[in-house]
Structure formats: C-alpha cells, structure tokens
Curated annotation (Swiss-Prot):
Biased composition (Pro residues): 754-773, 811-842
Comp. bias intervals (Acidic residues): 1082-1091
Protein name, entry field: Uncharacterized protein ORF78
Lineage, broadest ranks: Viruses, Duplodnaviria, Heunggongvirae, Peploviricota, Herviviricetes
Chain spans, region Disordered: 611-633, 709-740, 753-778, 795-880, 1060-1151
Coiled coil: none
Compositional bias (Low complexity): 867-878
Polar residues bias: start-end ranges: 1131-1142
Amino acid sequence: MSTDVVFDPKRVDKKHNNGLNLPDSLIKRWWSSDVTAVNNSYKNNNVNYNREYPLPDIFRSDPRKYKDVFPLQSHWIMQRYVTKVNEGIYKFLNYFDMKSSTFAPGFNKKEKTNYIHRIAKDLAAKANKEEIRNYSRDLINTLINMDGYDKLSPYLNFLIAILSDFINKTPLTIPTDKEWSRPGFNRIMNPGLVKMQNTYDCIKVFAWAHNYEEPKILFDYLGNRVACLTIIAKDPSASTAAENVFISSEIYSVDRYIWAAAPFNTKSSADWLTNTMYGDLTEEITYRFSPCFGGHCISAEEILTRKKVIDLYVNGEYKTIITGEGHPFGTVFDSMGMLRDPTFNGPLKDLPFTFKSIVDGFLHYGLKQKVTGIMVNMPKDDKWDIDRIRDVLLWMFEITTYRDKTITNFFVDQYVDRDDICCVPFQVAIGSNFSEDRKDNNSLVRQPYFMDPKFIKKYETGREDGTTRYNLKFKIEEDDEEDNILSINQEKITVDFSFFYNKLMDGGFMNKMDLCEIIFRTYAKKSPHVYGYFLLRGKAIKTRSDMINLFNGELRFENNSDDIIIGKKIYENGVDQLAEIFKEYNLNTSENMAGRFKQDPERRYITVNKFVKGDRSDSGGGPPPPPPPDEEEYEDIADEEITITPDVTEPVIANERAAITVVQSDIPEIPIEELITEEEEEEEPTPPPPVQTVATVDQPMVEIVPGQNLVPVGESPMSAPDIDLPIPGLPGPQPQIMEVTSGGPIIEEIESPPILPIQPPLPLPAPPTPQEPPKSILQPPKLIVEPKEVVVPTPPVIEQPKTPEEVPKQIVPPSPAVVSPPSPTTIPQEPPTQPSPIPSQPPVNIIPTQVPPRPGIGERPYPFFEPITPDTPAITPPKLVIKKPADEVIVEEPEEEEKPFVIIDEDEKMGEVEVGQGFPEPFSDRLTVDDLPLEDPRFKSEDVDDIMVAIDSQLEELGEGVGGDGDGGAFIIDPTLPPEVFIDIVDKTINVIEKRVATKRKISDDEEAESESARTRTWVRTTPKDFSGLTAATRGPRINITPKKKRKIVVTTEEEEKLLKEPVTESVEDLPSYEEVKLLDESDNEDDELDITSTPEDMETLKQSRAAPIRARRRGVVMDEESPIKPGSQPVDTSDATKISTDTDELTQQE
C-alpha cells in the first residue's frame, strides 16, 4: 500500500471544499442523532455499527474460556490488538466514509486501519521543522475545511491522542506538585487515575466530552482496544454527554472507562467548597484526600442483587472490592472526584435531577462518619420495584452507618461480556479516608485500610475448576453490642433522620421514608409515575410492621385508600399533573411543586412541606410542625427495638431479603447546626427523634482464581451452599497492617497467596536472605528511608552488605511486607528455562511513597521503580570519552564519584539475544511502534523517543490549554484552541526535536560515528556473550576489549541535553592515539591493568571488585559508592573464568 493514503492536499478534489469530500448527508445524519437514536442503535440504521461491525466472538463468549489465552496480567487487549484488526478504528474512519469518498476510494477494512497508523507514523517520522509544520498544517486544514468543522473538531484531538498512543510507551507517573498546578493539567490527571493506568499498562487516550457527539467518535475510534479511557468533562453540558457516553459504551463495547467530571470553573467551585457543607475542611478535602478516579453511577440493582466482594491485590496492598456491573443510562455521579476536585463547580449542581441532593446531604452526613463516596445509579427503564429500591437504601445505610473504613477509590476492572446487562462493570474499593491521626501525611495517594473483618463473613464453595466463590455477609447480632455491626469504634452511631428532612430537600418530607424519596426523585425524569407513586407510598409507614414490610417488599397501605387512589392517578397522568392531583386531594405544596419541577433545572424535585389531608409526622423544614393528629400511632416505633438477625449458617436462598432494624437510641444525635448550610440555618429546623438503622443484605458470590485475573461467575451465584472460609483479620491467614507515615499501611498475607495481582507490584527490600533479590533495573541512587519515617517498633536496619549475594542496602524494610508474584509489566520475569534460585519464593515488593528526585531531572519525583525500557530516560551516566581504533574500544572514566547507570542493548530491547535475561522484554506483550503493520523507511523508532522527550521538555512553555503526563508524549491539547495555536505549539517544540533527530541521524551513519561519538558522548555497548562478561562500563581501570559488533544508544536525559549544549573543547583528533592511551594505562595503572586473557586469579579479583557493583546497578540496587565491595570478601568459583557472564541471573547461579 502506497504512502499517499495519508492526507495529501494534491489529491483533494478541487471542486469540493471539505477536503475529504464528506457527503453532507453523512454529517447531518450522524451529528443529528439524539439519545433515542443511540439508545436504540440496534434498530437504528444510522448508527447500527453493531450490524456492520459485529463484535468478535471473544467478547460474546464466556471470558473464562480465554483466561489462559488472554490473561489480564499479560495485557490480553494488547495481544488482541496486535493479532486482530481493530474494529474501533473502522468505526472511527467510517465518519470519513472512505468507501464512497473520492479522497481514497475503495478502502477495505484493513486499509482503513492502516490509515490511522500511517497518520501517527508519518507525523512521528518527520525529521525537520518544515516537514512537521507542513504536515500538521495540511492535516489541520484538511479537517477545518470539512463541512461542519465545529462538529468534527474533536478529530484534531484524536489525531494527537493517536500520536501519543503510538509514540508514548512509558507508563504514567504520579504528577509532581509543579505539574499538578500547571495550566492545562488541572488536577484531572489525579494520582488515582495515574495509578490505575499503571495498573493495566493502558493506552493513554484523553478526550473531552463537550457534547453528545464526541463520545461517539471516541468510542468509535477506540472500540475494544482501549484498556482505560478517561473522558474529561470541561463544561456543565457534559452531563448530557455523560449520559450518552455510557449509552454509547454499551453499543461500542469499550472495555474499561473512567468518567472524570472536572469543569474548569475554579472560582465558583472554590466558593462552593468554602461556603457550603465543608467549611474549614476545604483544605483537607482539596489537598489531603486522595482524588478519586471514578465512575458513572454504579447500578444499585447490580451492587446489591449481584454484588461481588473480593480482596483485590493492587499496588502492593489488599483492597476489599465490591463489584457491581451497572447499566448506566443517565447522569454521571463521580462523588469522589467532584467533592475533592477544586476545579469542579459544585457537586453535580449542573446535572439534571436530584443527584445534587444526594451529594449535598448524604455525603455531608457521611463525611461525619468518614464516608467519602457514594455511587448510586438510575434505572434505564421503569421496571424497578420496591425490592430494588430497598436494596438501594440498604446499600446507602450500609456505607453511611456501618463502616468506619469506607469508600475511598473506585476501580474499573473485570471482563466484559457484550451480551451482559452492561459491558462496563465497576469495582468500588473499600478503604479509609482522611483521619485525625494521619493529618500530617501529605502523600497524594492515600492508602486504604481494611474494612473491619469482624463485620464480614465469607463463604466458600469449591468449584470443579479449582476456583472459589465468595459470599460476603454482614453479621448482625442482636445481643452482642461489641460485635454489632452498628458499632464503630465501640460507639453507637445514631441515624439522624431529621438530618435528611432538613438538609436534603429544603423543607423536609412527610415521613421517615425521605430517603426513599431521594432515590425515587432521581428516577423522575424517565419514570415520573414511579416517582409519584412512591412519593405517596412512603406515607404509609407508621408502625413497626410497616417498616419491616417496606424493606421486605411487602408494604401494606393500612386502609388508606387515598394513597392508592392518588398513586394510581399519578401513575396514569405523570408528574405534569401533580399539581392538579394534589389540589384535588387538598395536598398543599411548596412553591407549586409541579411548576417548580418543570421549570427550575437545578431544583427539579418536589418539596412537600405539609399534607393537609393525612399526616406530617416527621417533616423537619420550616417552622416546628404541629403535633401529629394521632400520637399513639407512632408510639410503637419509639418504644420498640427491632432486630432481625439472619442466620448466617444457613445456605443463601435466592431472592432472600434481609430486614432493616430500627432502634431508638439514647446517644445524642449529631447537631443539625453542623450539617446544614448557611442558607438553611435561617429555617431553624426541629429534628425528629433519632432512629438507628441497620441493614443486612445477601450478596452473591464471586469466582476468584488466586493469583490470576478475576472472572465473572457463570451461573447464579445464589445456588451454592455457603461454607465458612477464613479471611484476613479472622483466625487463619491474617493481614497485618503497619502504619507508615509516608504512605499508608503495608499489608502482608502471611500464609495464603495474594489474590488478583493486577497492579504490577513494585520493588521492595527484604531482609538479607540467600535468595535472589527482586530485579529492577532502575533505582534512584541511595534511596534510604530513615527509621524515623517508619512507624513500627524497632524496625530492622540492613547492614551494608559485603557480598554480591547479600541484598544491597536500599530501604529500611518494615517487617511485614507484601508478597506478590512479579508482573511482566514492571518486574522482569525469568523464562522457565532459567528459574530463580528459589522459585517458590517470589520477590517482595512495596510501593515507595516518598522518594528523592531522580538525578539530573530536577524537581521531578521518582514515584515508581520502573524498569528501563528503550524510551525510559536513563539515569545520567558519568562522562565518557570513547576512542575507536580498529575494533577496540577504550573507556575512560573520570575520577569523581560516578552515579549508577544502565546501558541497554538493542538486542535485548528487541528480545533477540539469549543472554541478558536480567533485562525485561519490554514490549513483547503490548503495542509498540514496531508492531505497526506497515513499513515506512522514513520512520525510525528512535525518532519517536526524541519527539516524546522533546514534547515533554517543552510542556511547561507551551502555555494555557496544553498538558502532559510528566513522562513525555501524552500531548493534551485544549480542543477550543484554534488551529494556528496548535501550529505554534508545534513550532515551539521543533527546535528540540530537530536538534535531537538531526543529531541521531548523523550519529547513525557509520562513517560519522567516530567523530560524533565524542561530541554526543554516545554510549557504546557490546554484546555480553562476545567478551566473556566484561562490559565497557565496568567500574575500575580501563579495559581493552574487542567486541564483535557495537550497539549505540544515546542517553536522552535532561542532564545529557545540557551536555549536548556544552561547547566541545576536545575534538577526536585532539585525543591521544590508541597506543598513547594504552601506554598511559600501563604507566598509571600497572597493577590494575587487565585484558581479556588475564589469568583466573586476575579474573577473580576483577569479578569481585567490579562486576558485582555493575551487576547490582543492573539490578537497580543502590550501592554505597563509599564502601565498595572488597576483593576476596566472598569466595567465588573461578574454575572456568572464560564462561563468566555479565548476565545477573547466570552469574548468581554460578556463585
């Protein structure tokens, strides 16, 4: 396929002014699609991609069948992308209607896919300023000249995202404070999101959901390939986009997505944070709470009727996860991100219907109980019955009342099944949030605690395939106060219903079912009859039996025929007729509830201040209510204690319903004055008697394969009997939580293996053992955590090791540590043919939380211990002067103290050599530039590295509207920028790109390599097997070696950039000749001079004195430069010195 498929102005038909000759009908047809059209896409020919591009069978079948073929930890999405044509790109290109356009007629599906690849490759392959400018201008002009450019402008962003996708292969890192506050960064790149993307090694695509259409473009382009998608809402209209994004997600089968709503109205959001419910907690909420990456509303039905609870091993810690597979139809509710993000203009105040009420009230109350997030979903249809509503209430009561260890993060994971109710399952992590004893912790990422295990009972059912299903229950014991689920820190918590009356709806409700009212009002948009029906249905709760029956789905109306009549009329006539219906039955309303419901977009809920006919038993708003007409009717609820204790030893029965417990408590209620806003303080509400509420709900089980990825349960999880299973915190294998002031608890599973190591575990020190330490190639130098930073009794300190077999000093290890099998993403894994010395003992890993900056980079932190990949900047090496006479290389090193460094062999990079197994095969299982299907002689992968680094180095100068990921290449452009601004941004980046590309192009020429190597300080790396284990970078005296061939890698760190800019005072011609250098070696270092034919005794001395330090550096271990390993400190078998290998694994085995 020729290269002229790319945008070529010469091929544009002159008689068409839209560049690609897009038919107007296509644009109008597509962009006029509304929610109904997308929602009914299976019936709508305009957007029926499901018919045109059917989903592969792998997504329609049981994903468990593919867990060995496409394991999650092996990036099965990437493997599928490499091996199959991506249907999402077809959808993306379908907008251009390639088959019918004169621009590129006759495209088949593969050619459409290659089209996008070529865009990225061509842009990355441009070698100079003019080429990039011209290409960019042509590309932009082609787009802006299309009809309906205002609709198609997102394509510009997607092209940039595509470029970033292909050229940026490094995982994201946690932003620094500098990056965090940089214009364009806007805190939307929060650490939680970054951590999650590192978890899955995701393709990083950032887009903006301004309107309804952009999400469709995004999903059409990305399709099933995207592993982690972030959609950033930049303005209030995004609520509509959000609704449709998730409808689209069902159609387009995105595997995982994240919703991050963050309009950029910083002042109004700051005012909201200050003036509403948080007050003096604003600073903690804004800066100390971990920003959440989080989701659309989890379906309450899925949360509770199909709830799955597992222990997920993420980032070196266990997290209790509730998995709910929700069906998102409507407004997005990111409770964590909205409440904590200073750029967000209030919690959902711009979103339709009463999610604002949920946030303003529920989360405020929940904050008092250390609740930081709630996710509730609205139903897509009108089929929700009282059982489902009860489940929603139980879940809400559960997180607001029962837990001191509450929701802090939202995880997205799980396989998707296109035929499932929704293909975007969610997981909600249960952990702790801000607490008094952690106020001084400035860590951006807060580590969660366990939910108190005494509240959990797990059950196990063995499966034929060896997997296990778990069921979680809450224990409610009537007489055991200490073990009662109501107990939080051994203190009773009062469920203050008056808070909801006064806080949530500006005037209260007619009864204690106000919470039901909140839930139903969220459904009023699509289900007005359900709203009105239950609005009145809740009025019938007057007795103990009513409360029980309501939550058992058996509410009786107690001879109140008006309730049934009114409810029936509302059901028949809808909410629009509420005013007339209420007037007919003498029901007074506040502010004409029907009119207010229809007219005020921010307050589309009905406030019933008083029922003239009937009772107003517990309304909290306005003046104090008159006494109820019949006080005896309410006495039993105040006098009785209702406790329903399910028998946890009984097998779970399908559709079994738990009950709600109402307790009259003597504990003083939470002062209402602390909970209401300044506006509502004028009302001076009168709270009703506090009621304590406890709920329990049966939860289905989840199928877990320890150490493997999570798979959904195929059949009904309710069918199997429950068997007691010990869990962390209970007798048996127990987690141990240790407080670390800089990063949260570190948990160790003592006996049982970790479950679901999705997040690649990170290197962590272990006590000195003969076993091989974890292999991490890159480490910050002398990263030592002082004992004062670790809050453990008498933390052990590792002495400086004397031998290579001892674990080098790195971090003071806390005694309990997380044990996790390594993941191919971050930790190099050995092939089966070369097992580690102790294969049964996997490496120990930990998350470093506060680390010194990387040398030569400046203020950028080094948050993760990442393996060096060909596009990861290496630590600044010592200066070298390299002379190449004939085939020999002489390496000269300065006398000053050198810093650790790593050299990467390109053979090892490509996974082509047998030796060097200490290095990972970085991209064997994920997308790289080399995996692109088309060959282009102009495109070179090293140019991509230069562009990536150059873009990153220029981000701070690019100005408003541009952001990056801090690691190069994640090029985020504000879509509102005009094309000329983008071109200017490109121009600002050209200088560095041009310099780097030109430099490397010159260096790559063999005839110029000798003269250019000294100027650019090019590393020369030889194949290890060619010179018996000695590297050119071996520390110590200069060594004469004769490599078979050389590999050149240019170190692209900022320090190296500075070196490139320094004037070169010494040319190659000025250097001493080879003979002179050799003579100098012999005269200055006669005792140390060694060559490749040295005796075994000399080899022993060399190996102990120099091979060990470089071996440690290649492992990423920080050596104490002031205490070098002394020769002879460890006996080494040198019976066959000629077979010594630099490979760390082989050498360790020989020793």
